[in-house]
């Protein structure tokens, strides 16, 4: 599916601020994917670009924690590739464990990013507040304020940040 068609669908479903955020995440994720590919790693840069664009399509129906799961459902309903649906489903923070999903009222399974493409989009999303790129310290502060200093998702965010940065060395 080409970028412009996906962007048109996103614009039809989501508010302007969500679209602008998705464009910023897509651009940053694409830059990261190209840089990682240039280091010799196997990465589907177009999947990352589209995944970044569509990761928050679930916000057309909800802004709750379930927007990743809802987004994956929307993408499947619209006939998008399963790889894109999984990017949406697994992009929140650095993922959600099955145990956390149960506590949050999500369908009971792991929502942790597995593929490199999923990880790049989740990481890029973490580092974009609205349309602005921020540092990892800002991300950690935001999640600590929201979830508490010792929440396991914060450690996962730091590990994901380290993993992506190591690929760029």
Swiss-Prot record:
HD domain: residues covered: 18-130
Cystines in this chain: none
UniProt superkingdom: Archaea
Pfam families, A to Z: HD
NCBIfam families linked: HDIG (TIGR00277), TIGR00295 family protein (TIGR00295)
Protein name: Uncharacterized protein MJ0778
Natural source organism: Methanocaldococcus jannaschii (strain ATCC 43067 / DSM 2661 / JAL-1 / JCM 10045 / NBRC 100440)
């Amino acid at each position: 599916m080409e970028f412009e068609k996906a962007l048109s669908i996103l614009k039809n479903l989501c508010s302007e601020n969500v679209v602008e955020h998705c464009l910023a995440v897509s651009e940053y994720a694409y830059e990261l994917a190209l840089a990682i590919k240039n280091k010799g790693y196997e990465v589907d840069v177009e999947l990352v670009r589209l995944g970044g664009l569509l990761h928050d399509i679930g916000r057309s129906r909800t802004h709750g924690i379930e927007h990743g799961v809802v987004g994956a459902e929307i993408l499947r309903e619209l006939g998008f590739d399963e790889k894109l649906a999984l990017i949406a489903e697994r992009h929140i923070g650095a993922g959600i464990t099955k145990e956390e999903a149960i506590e949050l009222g999500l369908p009971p399974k792991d929502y942790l990013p597995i593929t490199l493409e999923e990880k790049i989009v989740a990481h890029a999303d973490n580092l974009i507040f609205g349309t602005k790129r921020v540092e990892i310290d800002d991300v950690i502060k935001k999640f600590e304020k929201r979830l508490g200093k010792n929440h396991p998702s914060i450690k996962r965010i730091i590990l994901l940040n380290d993993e992506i940065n190591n690929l760029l060395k």
